[in-house]
Amino acid sequence: MADLGTNVRYIKGIGEVRANALEKLGIVTLGDLISYFPRGYEDRTAVRPIRELTAGESVCVRGMVAADPTPRRIAGGRTLVKTRVVDDSGAMDLVFFNAQHLGSSLRMGETYVFFGRVEDDLRRKQMINPLFEPEGRQQVTGRIMPIYPLTAGVTQGLMARAARQGLDACRELLPDVLPDGIRQAHSLCYVNYAYENIHFPSSPEALEVARRRLVFEELFLLTCGLQLLRQRRRDVAGPACHPMDMEPFYRRLPFALTGAQRRAIADAVGDMVSGKPMNRLCQGDVGSGKTMVAAACIWFAVENGWQTALMAPTEILARQHYQGLAPLLARFSIRCALLTGSTRARERREILAGLADGTIDLCIGTHALLTEDVQYQKLGLVVTDEQHRFGVNQRAALSQKAEDPHLLVLSATPIPRTLALVIYGDLDVSVIDELPPGRQKVDTFALGESYRPRVQAFIRKLAAAGQQIFVVCPLVGEPDQIPDERKAVTAYARQLQEQVFPDLRVAVLHGKMKPKEKERVMAAFAAGESDILVSTTVVEVGVDVPNATCMVVENADRFGLSQLHQLRGRVGRGKEKSYCILLSDSRNEETRARLKVMTQTNDGFVISQEDLRLRGPGDFFGQRQHGLPAMKIADLSCDMRLLDEAQTAARQLMAQDPELTEPTHQALRDRIRQLFDTNADMLN
């Protein structure tokens, strides 16, 4: 008796050879097969009279073969078969290449249904290599056909036949994991209907009903699984912290915190005194003051006797954190150290000794914090900055330096809260949704190439006023044609220096530089020793130069909105008016609409939502946590409403049955365990 775990090679009609081909697509079991959903569909339901056909469209035609399909040899040793079909409205030619045995399946005088792309050879309409079936015995014409993602050795025909055989084999095996009450409340179809019509829809309406059910189920299962993970993590003891009044910390700061910063700090401190490990994401717009939330948590941890590790994605950003936090935290006698890949051996040994004996309270660094010889006496808090620049394996490695430390993740990529729950999994979310007083609004302009002389004159005017300018240029072209990053940026900077701004000081920054060289260039720019910094997107994250008042982005159409917003965040950090100029000569309407969004708002959450709508969630999902199930059918660029419905339904169900232990929820719990296989031990 087959079950969903049965290898597809044992399914009737598939066998060893087809199973080996399907395995290339990740299809091993019957469950894999029926969950390998089409990426699109081809509507072959419309049968059109020949007279009404238009060149370029793909349609079905019902006609009688009116000429004997006789093969003949053509140049190159190929075989060509040409015939003609007629219906009540006219005639059309059919052309087949390398189909010398066609005569045995296509007989003159008989009626067939043909599907293909209509061509126009000036004399009459024709189809080249159309699909065809005898009238009344149709399987691939006259219906909506699935289009699957393929790989070498697997055709659409093989995939469709395998899906048909898989569905036939498991018709009685599919448990409906959605509780009846939820299915009925959300007007969802039964599971068998959903799988049948997602693969072989009987109509466009049936396809929509099936997809809605499967998307809801996928998001519902994900939400329930994350809720179970949260509950399991709450069963673990975190580093003990006692409640403390935060006012002594606030009073000694050189500036007042915003209400949003105080709320985020209260969230984090509440986690830390709960007795359970904090797992919190603090997300806020560029310049919203996330670092001060981290500083408050560091102070709170140190006051409770714990050490902290803060890991940044680049040495530039790590050093910047150190330069900002060390003097601030020195007010509270907190001892800080900076540990990066370029730290000298002697200094490194001293830092390692200080971490091991507890004389260093806070260590700020890069991936160097992950090496085996870095050991802490009493690590209680881990802070990671710019989460999207880290693999979660790195974050986990840092957390393993202590048993279940508190974790605070800072992200300047604002995303909708519902989406954050999907991407960051079991992290609780705090949002800093207001900027500190005095933070400048950056005026943004999207301009074409014709404006370049005026932009250059504007840059010269700013430089004459003692202000500085970033110029970001992407690497343009196909991957195998992109010039060496160092050469591309250096050549562009040389052009600016020699031909455009010979009287200004132009510096270069790119990712291929050694850390010390990057540091030297950035330090010189921050000290005002250069007027223009030409860079790749290495300046996207965290670089803080208050005197820089203009960001010019070349070929701005090459970037997503969220990335452009991050680049824009490098300016507007001082007292002077700041500007962002997006240069693009693209005539694409969608591209122009995207860049227009940048000129209309400085709100990172609005921009993020628009980026999600225009480009889909792919950029965000590069950040997804390891161990979360892959999404097979949900598309969060268009399924956000269903996500909201599914999350609400899941929360309501788990408020009634937090562990899903009721007998009616057994199938649901088993399915969640199967999906969260890498975290299954946490769901026991």
Residues covered by each model-derived region:
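Inter-lobe coupling/hinge segments of SF2-like helicase ATPases
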Residues: 234-237, 277-596, 656-660, 684
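N-terminal pre-P-loop "Q-motif" helix
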Residues: 255-278, 292
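Short, surface-exposed secondary-structure boundary micro-motifs
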Residues: 64, 117-118, 225, 556, ...
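C-terminal accessory region of SF2 helicases/translocases
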Residues: 587-684
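OB-fold nucleic-acid-binding modules
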Residues: 36-66
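Upstream accessory/linker segments immediately N-terminal to the RecA-like ATPase cores of bacterial MutS
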Residues: 71-252, 623
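Long, highly charged, low-complexity intrinsically disordered interaction regions
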Residues: 1-11, 20-23, 221-222, 232
